[in-house]
């Protein structure tokens, strides 16, 4: 494809602008949680895959953790099975866990791997069961009624991350592969657990001490009380916004995941609008970004 002079100049300007960021992030690990509209829109799927391949090509080390809740819902519906939720968490009995594992570890994971490979990458798919990549335990939840009585909630095979075998991921990175991880964990007895993909991505980033954690979502970012996107937050400011109710509802678990990662040693975490084409590249290689960045050193992270 040939470019006219104006197009060539524009391309050169883009590359020149990106150069300092490419140099800054060279050889750094970037953990990306892939989900939401970016997984269901064919154009956004291809855009994401190309972004990941480009990151690897210019010297970064992307690690992808994906969701797939809607795909699980679709298969359960086709099978005529009901799947209840409590506080947004899927109640997962043994038969439902089999479906979750089949969808996330099978069709969804391999679809992402194939798409990245189609665009020139060397992706390899994993679940937390492979080489005990994600050690998990049963997630314990409780609820308090109007009388102040607390009772346990049994979500079945829903888990939380105990540890991540980072050696497996580092071995793959060292061999020039792009790890693509399904959010399924395993306990010491060999039981499989369905784990929230945001939480898995956060823990993977923490155990790898990644440079950046990116959570692709269906929202523009964290909003202030006026409805404007907040581009940068410190952990202290996040705590204040949760306390005063600015951050509430379904945003709290996602922001808490990002916050925990930053407090665990990840340089920065960002909630990204995954509906924007090339959102991953825009967030890393430009000043503007397309979401809300959280960092202990906000000035350095935004520079």
UniProtKB/Swiss-Prot annotation:
Species per Swiss-Prot/TrEMBL record: Psychrobacter sp. (strain PRwf-1)
The major lineage groups are: Bacteria, Pseudomonadati, Pseudomonadota, Gammaproteobacteria, Moraxellales
Protein's pathway: Amino-acid biosynthesis; L-arginine biosynthesis; N(2)-acetyl-L-ornithine from L-glutamate: step 2/4
Q: Which Pfam families match?
A: AA_kinase
The record's gene field reads argB
What domain of life does the UniProt record list for this protein's source?
A: Bacteria
Q: What is this protein called?
A: Acetylglutamate kinase
Molecular function terms from GO? acetylglutamate kinase activity; ATP binding
Instruction: Report if keyword Transferase is assigned.
Output: yes
Q: Where is this site: Transition state stabilizer?
A: 33, 254
